[in-house]
Amino acid sequence: MAGPQDASLEEILWRSPPHVQMMGGYLHSNNILFYFAESPFFDATSNNASLAIQANYNEAFRHFVETREAFEGRLRTMQGLEFVVAYDPLQAAAQTDTQFAHEPSNVWVIRKQMRRKRAGQEDEVVVLATFFVVGDCIYMAPSVASVVGNRILSAVTSLTSLLKTASTLPIFTPAHGHTYLPPAPKPADAGQPGVPSQQSKENTPMPDAENPARVPLVGSQAGNTASTFQDTRTLAESLHLFLRYEDEYMDENPLVGEPGSFIMSKANDVDRTATAKQPQSTIPTKMGAPLVRVDTPGKGPEKVGTPSSSDESSLKKKKGGVGG
C-alpha cells in the first residue's frame, strides 16, 4: 500500500544538471543508476546503496560498479530491496556494437523491487514502484488506484457542478407540474378561422443579421422569466377569485358598518339587509284598452248640441238675404 510519502512522490519531478555534468555530460547505461541514486526517489537502505559503499572502501568490490551488468549481477545474488533498469533505450535501439537500428528514445525505466531467496527455486521478486527517466528528468509512475481515483474524483466533481446548475432550472406549478422552462403562451389568433395568417414583412430580419430572440435563456435569465410569468399568473388567479367570491363571507355574522365603527350583525339583520338590497319588481303589466267616454242623457242642466244666441242671429240674417 502506498503511504503518504509515496503519494507525494507521484506529484514531483526531479532533475539535476550538475550531476549530469559530473558524470560525463550525458546519461548512459553505466551511470543511470548512480544518477537515480541522487534523487529523492532512492532508498538509502537498499542493496544498491550498500554495494556502492562497499565498493568505495573495498577494492575487491570496485569492479561491480564499473558496468551496469556487473552491478545488477551482484544485486541478484543479494536478498532485499533493490533498484534495477527494466528498459534501456540504447540496448533496445542497438543493432550492432557501433550502429543503431533506430534513434534511441532516451527514456529509461527503473523498477523498485523486493527480492527474496528461496532454496531450490527461483527468487521471488515483487515490484513495488516504477520510475521513468526522460532526458535528465525523473518521474514516478502513478499506481492504478491513483489513476482510477483521480478519474472518479474528476467525474464526481463535474456531476456536482452540473447538479448545482440544474437545481435552479426546474419550476413547479400545480397546473403544469415540474418544468424546466415556462410554457410559451399560444398566440390568440393562431387557430381562429377567417383571420389572415400573413404577417408584416417590415420587421423581417435579414439572413446575416443576428436574431436576439433566438438566443437561449440560461441561468439567471431563465429564472427571471419564469418568476415574472408565475407572478403574472398568480395575480390573474387572485383577481378572478376575488370577482367570483366577493359577496361570500367565511363568518356566520359578518362585520357591517364603516371602517372604524364595525359591528357584528345578527343573522336576521343580515337577511333583512339582503332583502332590502333586492331591487323592486319591474315586471311590466298589461296595458288596458283606451277608455272611451260615452255621454248619456241625464238630469244635468247642460244640453248637448244646443245652439247659442250668436249662432241664431247669424242664421236669421242669412234667411233674410235669401228671401229679398
Swiss-Prot record:
- Superkingdom assignment: Eukaryota
| Name this polypeptide is given | Mediator of RNA polymerase II transcription subunit 6
Mark the transmembrane ranges: none
Task: State the InterPro entries in the record.
Answer: Mediator_Med6, Mediator_Med6_fun, Mediator_Med6_sf
Kindly indicate whether the keyword Transcription regulation belongs to this entry.
Answer: yes
Q: Which GO terms describe its molecular function?
A: transcription coactivator activity
> Where in the sequence does UniProt note compositional bias of the Polar residues kind?
221-230, 275-284
Query: What gene is it encoded by?
Result: med6
- Organism equals Aspergillus fumigatus (strain ATCC MYA-4609 / CBS 101355 / FGSC A1100 / Af293)
The annotated subunit structure for this chain is: Component of the Mediator complex.
The record, for Gene3D superfamilies, names:
Mediator complex, subunit Med6
Q: Which GO terms describe its cellular component?
A: core mediator complex; mediator complex
Which family is this sequence assigned to? Belongs to the Mediator complex subunit 6 family.
Q: Does the keyword Nucleus apply?
A: yes
